[in-house]
Regions:
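N-terminal, positively charged nucleic-acid-binding surface of large information/translation enzymes
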Residues: 1-148
Length: 148
């Protein structure tokens, strides 16, 4: 029987770091620390959650994470609330295709409220994967108090 491959040193360090951050509320402490210069607002924008997170999402996310970290280190409070109000049109196009809709009247017959709820549910299909990957790339975002 083949031996199970052991985790690399990098993978073990990642797990240790994430565990330390979580057990010691490091992100929470960074957000709650004194902010003598007041609040700095950073509008991150939601992910394109039309599928699983991929390299392009991760690169953009890492770059965007640098801005609130910089301003936090400069003495500002920078809230980092994650959100799921995901770019309506791409999600709507996916849902229309899944439901076989060709025209606006199809949406009206289906019901606008019901269509909107179906779109919202479609966005949240991948929420769990996003909630796993964002901390793993070292990004600090408040996903527990997210907005939908």
């Amino acid at each position: 029987m083949a031996e199970k491959p052991q985790k690399s040193d990098a993978a073990l360090r990642e797990e240790e770091t994430l565990k330390f951050w979580q057990e010691n509320d490091i992100f929470k402490k960074s957000v709650e620390k004194d902010a003598p210069k007041g609040e700095y607002v950073f509008y991150d924008g939601p992910p394109f959650a039309t599928g699983l997170p991929h390299y392009g999402h991760i690169v953009a996310s890492v770059i965007k994470d640098a801005v609130p970290r910089f301003w936090t280190m400069r003495g500002y409070s920078v809230p980092r609330v994650w959100g799921w109000d995901c770019h309506g049109l791409p999600i709507e196009n996916i849902v229309e295709k899944e439901l076989g809709f060709k025209h606006k009247k199809d949406i009206i017959q289906y019901g606008i409220d019901k269509f909107n709820e179906t779109c919202r549910a479609r966005v949240l299909t991948y929420a769990e994967e996003w909630e796993k990957i964002i901390p793993r790339i070292g990004r600090w975002a408040d996903m527990e108090n997210d907005y939908k």
